[in-house]
Design a protein with these regions (language model features):
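Intrinsically disordered, low-complexity acidic Ser/Thr-rich regulatory segments
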Residues: 1-65, 77, 81-84
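Forkhead-associated
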Residues: 46-127
Length: 128
């Protein structure tokens, strides 16, 4: 009785021996913050993937008029992760810190419904 042979494939042409990298474009993502507690309660802020600044200073994208908030308190931004954009919050060495779900953070991945606290203000993160 003979052993069946496995079929053999012809060798790949030169330069095609490495696997092809498949590029995946990040899907559009919509994210925003809603001010739950603070001077602008109920206000909605759309987040830009390239970055959204938050602080007491007048040049911030999101202005929080609270003396416990630093002039340039934190920054929200997105980075591509596989096929979607992942949003982060980063504290900018603020005096009183940035908190996500009760924990002080330096840089933190954000998930839908996370609560961000800066000074006396509480904002909820939303993402589609």
């Amino acid at each position: 009785m003979s052993t069946p042979l496995s079929p053999t494939l012809p060798p790949l042409p030169d330069g095609e021996s490495e696997p092809t990298l498949v590029l995946v474009e990040a899907k559009p993502s919509f994210a925003w913050l809603v001010m739950l507690h603070g001077p602008r309660r109920g206000r909605l802020y759309h987040l830009r993937a390239e970055g959204t600044s938050l602080g007491r200073g007048a040049t911030n994208d999101i202005i929080v008029d609270d003396e416990a908030v630093s002039r340039f308190h934190s920054r929200l931004f997105a980075e591509p992760v596989f096929d979607k954009l992942q949003f982060y919050v980063q504290d900018l060495a603020s005096a009183n810190g940035t908190f996500v779900n009760g924990l002080r953070v330096v840089r933190q991945v954000l998930h839908d419904e996370d609560r961000i606290v800066v000074g006396q203000a509480t904002l909820v993160f939303k993402q589609l």
